[in-house]
């Protein structure tokens, strides 16, 4: 079996920055708390919790009865709405903002466009943390999720009657789907449309790698958390190109791969390299695989 590694694997800059900063706080014995997962990777989150990180699903679930002088609130890589930020600053003496710089740039762009009179259309998932943080900064907006009905969007805009519309995206969405939505919006009559592709370049490059692996391999192993938007997207891209994609977090989740002569390996941007290495080693030793690095290193 030949095992082909994607050119880029592991954490992106924003995720690595957030994880390493959280580890430093925990090593300093800070009482670190966060609303939601730092990253959407179950293995990474278990390690951080084992180090002492306290994770709460929402603001109302935070227990303030045991806060101490060394307590610190963390704003995760996806960002937080201004209301949440203000609340944390009031209740904690120290707040560490680990919002990904690329995500923060999207927040700033959206606010600037709104100030210029644009009605904001967001291509993203309404329950995703990044989208929630973005919406908390805007006065009015429309979220367009995958699988949208464009006639419904047209009807909404006819009723809303905006003169100008600005399209932006959650940073981890599928770039091809974004472009298709942009193309449809640009055809609307009587509305000035500004298209702003705010999808992260790292995720766009991973999409291209997923397509390349699907075109050159018999199957592709996609390594990453089950709740990771960008990891799940890679698996869907592979399958859309007619190849089997196995979205796994550990070797135990892999099926029998003996029927495949060439298997690709790619990861989401919230997947640590040690997680990828475990799966690579398992495939290599189980199937006597030859690793083709293709520029990729683990």
UniProtKB/Swiss-Prot annotation:
Key word Cytoplasm present in the record?
no
Q: Does the keyword Electron transport apply?
A: no
Going by the UniProt record, its keywords in alphabetical order are: 4Fe-4S, Iron, Iron-sulfur, Isoprene biosynthesis, Metal-binding, Oxidoreductase
> Where is [4Fe-4S] cluster annotated to bind?
12, 100, 200
Q: Catalytic center at which residues?
A: 130 (proton donor)
Q: In which pathway does it act?
A: Isoprenoid biosynthesis; dimethylallyl diphosphate biosynthesis; dimethylallyl diphosphate from (2E)-4-hydroxy-3-methylbutenyl diphosphate: step 1/1; Isoprenoid biosynthesis; isopentenyl diphosphate biosynthesis via DXP pathway; isopentenyl diphosphate from 1-deoxy-D-xylulose 5-phosphate: step 6/6
Residues recorded as binding dimethylallyl diphosphate, renumbered to this chain, are 40, 78, 128, 228-230, 270
Pfam families referenced in this protein's UniProt entry, alphabetically: LYTB (PF02401)
The protein's GO terms of the molecular function aspect are: 4 iron, 4 sulfur cluster binding; 4-hydroxy-3-methylbut-2-enyl diphosphate reductase activity; metal ion binding
- Give the EC number(s) listed in the UniProt record: 1.17.7.4
Any one GO biological process? dimethylallyl diphosphate biosynthetic process
The highest taxon in the source lineage is: Bacteria
Question: What does the entry comment about cofactor binding?
Answer: Binds 1 [4Fe-4S] cluster per subunit.
InterPro entries reported for this sequence:
LytB/IspH
Q: Where does isopentenyl diphosphate bind?
A: 40, 78, 128, 228-230, 270
Which positions in this protein are listed as binding (2E)-4-hydroxy-3-methylbut-2-enyl diphosphate? 40, 78, 128, 171, 228-230, 270
**Co-factor requirement:** [4Fe-4S] cluster
Q: Sorted alphabetically, which PANTHER family does this protein's record hold?
A: 4-HYDROXY-3-METHYLBUT-2-ENYL DIPHOSPHATE REDUCTASE
Q: Which family does it belong to?
A: Belongs to the IspH family.
Please give the function described in this protein's UniProt entry. Answer: Catalyzes the conversion of 1-hydroxy-2-methyl-2-(E)-butenyl 4-diphosphate (HMBPP) into a mixture of isopentenyl diphosphate (IPP) and dimethylallyl diphosphate (DMAPP). Acts in the terminal step of the DOXP/MEP pathway for isoprenoid precursor biosynthesis.
**Name under which the protein is recorded:** 4-hydroxy-3-methylbut-2-enyl diphosphate reductase
- Organism equals Kosmotoga olearia (strain ATCC BAA-1733 / DSM 21960 / TBF 19.5.1)
């Amino acid at each position: 079996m030949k095992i082909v590694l994607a050119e880029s694997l592991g954490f992106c800059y924003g995720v690595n920055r957030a994880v390493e900063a959280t580890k430093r706080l925990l090593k300093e014995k800070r009482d670190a708390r966060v609303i939601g997962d730092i990253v959407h990777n179950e293995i990474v989150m278990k390690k951080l919790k084992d180090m002492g990180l306290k994770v709460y699903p929402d603001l109302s679930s935070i227990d303030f009865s045991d806060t101490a002088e060394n307590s610190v609130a963390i704003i995760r890589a996806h960002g937080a709405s201004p209301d949440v930020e203000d609340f944390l600053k009031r209740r904690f003496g120290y707040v560490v903002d680990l919002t990904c710089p690329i995500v923060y740039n999207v927040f700033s762009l959206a606010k600037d466009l709104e100030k210029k009179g644009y009605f904001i259309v967001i291509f993203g998932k309404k329950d995703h943390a990044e989208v929630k943080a973005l919406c908390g900064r805007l006065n009015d907006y429309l979220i367009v999720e995958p699988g949208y009905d464009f006639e419904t969007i047209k009807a909404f805009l006819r009723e809303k009657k905006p003169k100008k519309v600005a399209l932006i995206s959650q940073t981890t969405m599928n770039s091809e789907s974004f472009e298709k939505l942009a193309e449809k919006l640009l055809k609307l009559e009587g509305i000035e449309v500004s298209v702003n592709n705010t999808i992260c370049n790292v995720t766009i490059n991973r999409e291209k790698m997923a397509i390349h692996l699907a075109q050159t391999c018999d199957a592709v192993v996609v390594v990453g958390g089950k709740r990771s938007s960008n990891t799940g997207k890679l698996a869907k891209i592979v399958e859309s190109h007619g190849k089997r994609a196995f979205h796994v977090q550990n070797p135990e989740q892999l099926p029998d791969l003996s029927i495949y002569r060439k298997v690709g390996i790619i990861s989401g941007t919230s997947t640590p390299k040690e997680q990828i290495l475990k799966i690579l080693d398992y495939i290599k030793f189980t199937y006597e695989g030859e690793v083709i690095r293709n520029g990729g290193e683990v």
